[in-house]
Amino acid sequence: MGVAMRRMGPKLKQVKRRREGSSITSQAKGVRMSGPGVARRQLLLNTARKMLRTTRLAELSLGEVARRAKVGKGSAYFFYDDVNALCASLKGLIDNEFQEVLRAPLTQSVSSWQEVIRLLYHRGIAFLENDPAACQLAIGVDASPALKLMDRANDVVAGRIFDEQISQRFVLPIIPDRPKLFFRALSLTDMMLSISMLERGKITPEYVEEGCRAAIAYLQIYIPEKLPRKKPEEFD
């Protein structure tokens, strides 16, 4: 028994080292990265985003992204387990940009909360139309369930932004979990836009309008058609 254990000792140490190495690699993918590593990862993201202007999401591969980015395939698979992980990372980046677009102050004069909804909604539409990658990852027919789930999370944040933007100009009623109403309204717009992508292969004006109408109609179940306006000095 003792002799057998001594013979197995080196093998056990090798297995342990391999396991520790795998753990370190996993941590490196999500936590530690050198300057050149950050640059290569960003290059992969930028290349994937550029490729999605002309390539369907279903046809994207991590190997091809790495080749076009001139990043070693081994490095690409060090950063991302597969193309789905790359797309999820790109989706997170795009969602942050999308949210900043919605957060930008409204410079137009608005007369109703519905007008604020329309202005913000069309900001989002313009963002999607100007970035095919954003469009494919959010409402494209090839978007995976994981990407769709990420888009719902993005809608949660966007719903809070809509609530805040309207609250800048109008006195909204006190409703428990009020931002959730805007999240649900935005989910309705996403459904209309997804149908547009499925039927027409692009975002069409008809479905844009249908989405906006659906969102406002839903919100008007809970929010009065007319809200008290805030005085300019009361703007947040």
Predicted regions and their residues:
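Generic hydrophobic, amphipathic alpha-helix propensity
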Residues: 37-48, 65, 90-98
